[in-house]
Amino acid sequence: MAKKKSEEHSSADANDSDYQEEPNFDDPPNFVDNINDEDLLGDMLAQRPSEADGVESVVVVDNIPKVEPSRLEKLKSVILKVFSHCGEIVNVVYPVDDEGTTKGYAFMEYRHASQAEDAVKKLNNHRLDKNHTFAVNLFTDFQKYENIPEKWEPPTVQPFKIQNDLYNFINDPDAYDQYCVAAETAPNCVQVGFWQNTLPEPNELETRERFTDTFVKWSPLGTYVVTFHKPGVAIWGGSNFQKIQKFPHTGTQFVEFSPCENYLVTYGPTPTGQKIIIWDIRTGSEKRSFVADGMSVLSMFRWSHDDKFVARMGENSIHIYETPSFYLLDLKSIKIPGIRGFSWSPTDNVIAYWVEEQNQIPARVTLMEIPKKREIRNKNLFHVADCKLHWQKSGDYLCVKVDRYSKLKKDKKELDVKFLGMFYNFEIFHMREKEIPVDSVEIRELILAFAWEPIGNKFSIIHGELNSSNVSFYEVNKGVKPSLVKRLEKKSCTHLFWSPRGQFIVMANLTMGTFEFVDTTNDYIISASPDHFRASEVEWDPTGRYVVTGVSSWKVKEDTGFNMYTFQGRIIKRTILKNFVQFLWRPRPPTLLSEEKQKDIKKNLKKYYPAFEQKDRLRLTRASKELLEKRSQLRETFMEYRNKRIAEWKDQKSRRVMLRGHVDTDNLETEEVDEEIVEFLVKEEITLLE
């Protein structure tokens, strides 16, 4: 062992002698380093603690009521109640004059500087009463404004940036509609393609990889498309779908645009519930935020048709906020004991709400005019289990679907309530008639679906058993009770989708993937009955000419994609797309033509037919010509490639002959070929003979 160890040492010494001397990394004499600490350690110096004077957590509140010493304690309790929502208050100072009267402002110190910033953000311009609106500022802001130079310097002129045209999509001379198709390429990574529904084939406008984490949504007028990301949401628009604005709200799950696209509401989870933020779309600024217990009906905001008001339901109340200040209307909520649901008219500032039965008092449906808060119609209802409010798109009618019972059964503690002998009523409010008359339609069968005709005076319902239901169509006319005009029996459908232009309807079974296209003009003829197995969505285009059914990967993982049909149910296009997520038509803004001009165009529509037919023929001819030119170009490209390879093959002949033993194998005759037959055993079978 000793000998072996000594050998190892001698070997190590020999190896050490082979190594070169270690290099010297010391700076040469008189060397000057030109790198400063900011360049070398910038990221670390940015985290260096800075000196603080201790006033970062102090806010100054102006426009506080001036009160005498006898009322000071009451004032303190009111102010403390308002400002304590933003954090823990350490100290409050109310300066007073010689007589002890407050001077109208106060200094308030929070536990942390972030709480003071939150107080400025939330409570600045907070209205205490009719005569006092708080002006809240950080104490450090006064020092900042003191350091403003007295000599004014003109701002630097910024170069003009050409604004993106947000409405270019409606300037297409042929008025082709656009749509987007989303497909998931990886977890939390969705590709979105934007297309124009041109003839004979759609035209791809733009495709974005990793455009959103989950899904996309169009704004009501089609100006913007919103994408969802972990830090928040972003809206895009213009010819190339450039980013218009981003709204930081971590974990946003759902958004809602106001009807006129002035505001955006984002809903995101918090550890204790749901945070809701209302944003100004044009400026990107936060207008107001709310905290709710969870994602429920109580937390949802609903907008008036003109963006002037937004409302949400509270416990036994409705909170209506005015825009753009987002203060409560008349600085108070509307107290409505027992309210269970409400909805805005799509064309007027009228709210419909219903109240449940309480202590032998019947349920009630009320129409209230805003901002006057004047009740314009009431309807009492008895034996009510639930109500659903359905406005017609034109605002001409309101249908209240009433779930009624014959008998009520309660347990001993009255916690569990069972309704027996259920039947259903449809209360139809005629909004355009004097004193708003109400008609009633009673159905004794289970109601599976209800849908108004968007433009017209008909509504349809699915009633009966799920696998063998009936579809009934009713017509509503002035001064006459709603009449049953058609009943289609034994139809296996679960949903109803009216065309945006009325007249045509798709009766869909989204469980089995079957569809029936119906024309409701005269005889309610079923024009087509296609099927799309596992289809989970139906989308009409804004003009009512095309219908798309889709199989989303949210529902199944195989055979995802979408089919496109005409309004009569004729198949136009089948698209199989892996991990297809959603298909959305781009909405269109309302037409600028007057009612008289639209009627005149419809009346003289035959006059425009020849021009349209000629344009269609030219388009098809142009498409055929383009197809022939494309094929000719492909053939020329192939022949060019082929000739190039043949020339290369000829140039290599001498090399090829040399490698093949000086035998020209390119021109071998059949006689020079030796044919050899080889036989081998494939399988062996044994047959026993008797």
From Swiss-Prot:
WD repeats lie at residues 207-246, 293-331, 334-369, 442-484, 530-575. InterPro entries: EIF3B, eIF3B_RRM, Nucleotide-bd_a/b_plait_sf, RBD_domain_sf, RRM_dom, TIF_beta_prop-like, WD40/YVTN_repeat-like_dom_sf. Its main location: cytoplasm. The keyword 4Fe-4S does not apply. Residues 57-141 form the RRM domain. It is found in: Cytoplasm. One of its GO terms (biological process) is regulation of translational initiation. One of its GO terms (molecular function) is translation initiation factor binding. Residues 1-33 are annotated as: Disordered. Residues 614-645 form a coiled coil. Keywords: Coiled coil, Cytoplasm, Initiation factor, Protein biosynthesis, Repeat, RNA-binding, WD repeat. Residues 1-11 have a biased composition (Basic and acidic residues). It comes from the Eukaryota. It holds the Pfam family RRM_1. The keyword Transcription does not apply. Residues 15-25 have a biased composition (Acidic residues). Gene3D superfamilies: 3.30.70.330, YVTN repeat-like/Quinoprotein amine dehydrogenase. PROSITE patterns: RRM. GO terms for cellular component: eukaryotic 43S preinitiation complex; eukaryotic 48S preinitiation complex; eukaryotic translation initiation factor 3 complex. PANTHER family: EUKARYOTIC TRANSLATION INITIATION FACTOR 3 EIF3 -RELATED (PTHR14068), EUKARYOTIC TRANSLATION INITIATION FACTOR 3 SUBUNIT B (PTHR14068:SF0). RNA-binding component of the eukaryotic translation initiation factor 3 (eIF-3) complex, which is involved in protein synthesis of a specialized repertoire of mRNAs and, together with other initiation factors, stimulates binding of mRNA and methionyl-tRNAi to the 40S ribosome. The eIF-3 complex specifically targets and initiates translation of a subset of mRNAs involved in cell proliferation. Belongs to the eIF-3 subunit B family. Component of the eukaryotic translation initiation factor 3 (eIF-3) complex. The eIF-3 complex interacts with pix. Interacts with mxt. This is Eukaryotic translation initiation factor 3 subunit B. It comes from Drosophila willistoni.
